[in-house]
From Swiss-Prot:
Family: Belongs to the GINS4/SLD5 family.
Source lineage: Eukaryota, Viridiplantae, Streptophyta, Embryophyta, Tracheophyta
Presence of the UniProt keyword Nucleus in the record: yes
Compartments reported by the entry: Nucleus
Organism: Arabidopsis thaliana (Mouse-ear cress)
Name the UniProt record assigns to this protein: DNA replication complex GINS protein SLD5
Alphabetized UniProt keyword annotations: DNA replication, Nucleus
Length: 220
């Protein structure tokens, strides 16, 4: 027969872990990992996940000190490990995209709005360090017209040396509900694709981009 403390521990476990934040974090991680561009930073979700992780860590320490059933402790530890993995992986994927597309993320208003304040600082430092490195090792040795980090030459009208995300990349996605999307850019063709709830689709990212942002579609 379980002791009162063990029974209480089990009840607390059910209460603490009956949250959708871990599933939301998993969704954010999957979308971020599969998308060719950086997505909107899930600040509120990350903050809640950090608070939950701290709470579970404190709970584990308390249960170990009070001799709670090791099985209950192990359940907490598994959920803690899962939450920590998802959070770290989510943030790591974003940092990799910031490093890869640092100039694009800083020069594009849409991309910059998706970054957290800390990510903006990180992107700025990365861009400054890379620009300084190029200037010291290569650019200052070239003719003046070719000393730009962003352009092939000063006569270029656009930043043609800046790597950008390939939005034409094909992705695998699942629709949460029935969705009808245009297959082409506005003014090109009225052809649409109808996506049924729960079905998987292999489709160009830019077609489902807005539906992903609105939460109608998840990447796999």
């Amino acid at each position: 027969m379980a002791s009162n403390s063990e029974a209480g521990g089990s009840a607390d476990y059910e209460t603490l872990m009956s949250t959708s934040d871990v599933e939301l974090l998993k969704r954010a991680w999957r979308n971020e990992k599969a998308a060719p561009e950086i997505l909107q930073y899930e600040g509120a979700l990350v903050d809640r996940a950090k608070e939950q992780i701290e709470l579970v860590e404190e709970t584990i320490e308390d249960y170990v000190e009070n001799g709670i059933d090791p099985l209950v402790v192990s359940l907490y530890q598994m959920d803690l490990d899962r939450a920590q993995f998802l959070l770290r992986s989510y943030l790591r994927v974003r940092l990799l995209k910031i490093e890869k597309f640092m100039f694009h993320n800083l020069n594009s208003e849409e991309a910059e709005r998706r970054l957290s304040e800390q990510e903006k600082v990180f992107a700025t430092r990365c861009a400054d360090d890379l620009a300084k490195h190029f200037e010291e090792t290569v650019l200052l040795k070239l003719p003046e017209n070719y000393q730009s980090v962003l352009k092939q030459s000063l006569i270029s009208e656009v930043d043609d040396m800046v790597p950008q995300p390939h939005l034409d990349t094909f992705v695998v996605c699942r629709s949460k509900n029935f969705v009808s999307l245009n297959l082409y850019e506005e003014g090109e063709s009225p052809e649409t694709v109808e996506m049924e709830r729960g079905d998987l689709y292999f489709i160009r990212y830019k077609i489902v981009k807005r539906a992903i942002e609105s939460g109608q579609i998840d990447l796999i």
